[in-house]
Amino acid sequence: MITRGLMLALACSFLVLAGCRSAPVMNVVDAPVGVSRSAQQVEQAIVSAGNSLGWQMRPMGPGRIEGTLLLRDHRAVVDIDYSPRTYSIRYKDSSNLHYDGGTIHKNYNGWIENLDRAIRNRLT
């Protein structure tokens, strides 16, 4: 009886710990640029911020940049839409981050927070 209870407790603990590894996907939507900037200045700030953190930033046309972060065997890809007034960072693709339609490995959100912070710092 004790063995069965112990097995059940271990199984529940494993499920709880496994669930802690994922979190809802974080997107940054319409973050204000702040002071008046041109679209080119906003693009330069985004590219500079991403590059400083190891992101590969690739302009995809007016108002859009694709950012790719490669860490060990993980890959995160985001679309960054911007204007002179706002910018948005949205999930696009990933590998080895256990993306499941709305949740992803918890480290992803930290990478997005760092990117957002670096962009904001360059725009102030």
Specify the residue positions occupied by each region the protein language model found.
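Bacterial N-terminal signal peptides that target proteins for export
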Residues: 1-7
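C-terminal motif of bacterial Sec signal peptides marking the signal peptidase cleavage site
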Residues: 16-19
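Ser/Thr-rich, low-complexity intrinsically disordered terminal regions
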Residues: 21-124
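Generic detector of short alpha-helix boundary/capping microenvironments
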Residues: 7-8, 38
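Sec-dependent N-terminal signal peptides
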Residues: 8-14
